[in-house]
Amino acid sequence: MDKNATNYPLSVSMPQHCAYVVRDLPHATVEQRERALNATHWNEFAFPSGMLTVDMLSDSGTTAMTNQQWATLFLGDEAYGRNTGYYVLLDTFRDIFERGGEKNWKKVIDLVRTDCRDIEKMMDEVYLCEYEGGLFNGGAAQMERPNTFIIQQGRAAESVLMEIVKKILAARHPGKVFTIPSNGHFDTTEGNIKQMGSIPRNLYNKELLYEIPEGGSYEKNPFKGNMDIEKLEQLIQGVGPENVPLVFTCITNNPICGQPVSMANIREINRVAHKYDIPLVFDVARWAENCYFIKMNEEGYADKSIAEIASEMFSYCDVFTMSAKKDGHANMGGMLAFRDRGLFWQKFSDFNEDGTVKTDVGVLIKVKQISCYGNDSYGGMSGRDIMALACGLYESCDFGYMHDRVQQCEYLAQGFYKNGVKGVVLPAGGHAVYINMDEFFDGKRDHTTFAGTGFSLELIRRYGIRVSELGDFSMEYDLKTPEQQAELANVVRFAIDRSRLTKEHLDYVIAAVTELYKDRESIPNM
């Protein structure tokens, strides 16, 4: 035995957490589940969660929060105006997305957690701090030029953004139809774009997405969520830059099987968008997962922390919307922010002839936020949820936690693949495993059958496992143009809750899907 050794490696991973509370699962029968399916019109979203064995419908808001988060719930300030959590949350975002890594964090949340009674210190370090020029104005700048908006979830942030953009574009260009490209619009983003009368486009490499190397393993992640830069250039030139008001990037690329986006690709998207004077909008529900993939797979980032990578990544966007119910490691929360006096502000504000501001787009967004969701101090969130979110954002920067999470996804995907299930998208993303329904059914089900929905409902009926169909049915294949149909990934998603599922759950799902695959011919169409 080497007494001087400082490390004793094992062939298994070190546990990342332990359970404080457990919930017993129901034992519903096939007959009971079928009765419930009939009663809910065979709608996977309407099926009672209390009758499920494993619920993988979404990873949004389903997190098992940490003991630190539960503790901060008790520190929630429910004041209507400028609750303490407002200051803490905005500075948490500055810490992680702007300050370049842990060594530069202020972490003012610790002043609240330690019950700081020094009023002068709280005024100087929390309440009266002035910030401008970035994504999170503070103090007088946030009041004069609001650019940061707490909203209770991501789709609401998208809705506020797109409603204001729609209003501005309609006033300037009545009747004009715009095109908004992305590497992959999620269904809510696509819905919000359609509601503003614009055309959503998904520009990614579909052939690469479904490609699998022999043996099912890549040496390095190929970043299948990347935007196809050539297609982006062609689209902008084809429709004209004046007809593309925004370029979106989904990070990680949820509709395209949760695949990550490389930093090199993000830089290129930024370059192309700014070349044509178009603001770049990030949809960053899973920002931390994407930073993990960059760290593990992209040259030059191995020695950087998740927070350091996040600071660089966010430096390339003009606007971002976030559902913080994912990588906020929380059950509720969202954010909309744009760069102070940046390209989005310049393009969508109105100015007088002398250059002074006539209408500030941030003020329009703030009015919408307050009229629909509540005072800008809380944006529809409770004070306790704001504090839990601030704590959770730091939790998502922990490499050990994130590594464990991504490995859970890969374990599930490899379990399907090794059991011969066709259509598994590899490598797995950071939040879910996806199966290509076209390949699963051997190309025998056309797009009018909505077989992915049939698959998801049969999985509920037989085994009490709920997943999300994110293909032909939910993305409205039959209502799309031929171009849009070609861009659609006909998949179902097995979302993995944060810090909640065990290997036992995953093994049960692997066994169930394997058996269903063997009997796939009997799965009914919709």
Q: What is each PLM-predicted segment?
A:
Residues 252, 344, 442-451, 499-508:
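Short, conserved charged micro-motifs
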Residues 46-67, 79-91, 477-480:
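A structural motif shared across PLP-dependent enzymes of the aminotransferase-like
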Residues 72-76:
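Aromatic- and Gly/Pro-rich donor/ligand-binding loops
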Residues 100, 171-172, 396-397, 474-526:
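PLP-dependent enzyme catalytic core of the Aspartate aminotransferase-like
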Residues 410, 414, 453-461, 507:
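Feature representing long, continuous alpha-helical segments
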Residues 2-41, 59, 69, 81-88, ...:
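Conserved PLP-enzyme active-site core in the AAT-like
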Residues 38, 44-66, 418-426, 453, ...:
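Anaerobic metallocofactor- and corrinoid-dependent redox/one-carbon enzyme cores
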Residues 423-495:
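Conserved PLP-binding catalytic core of the aspartate aminotransferase-like
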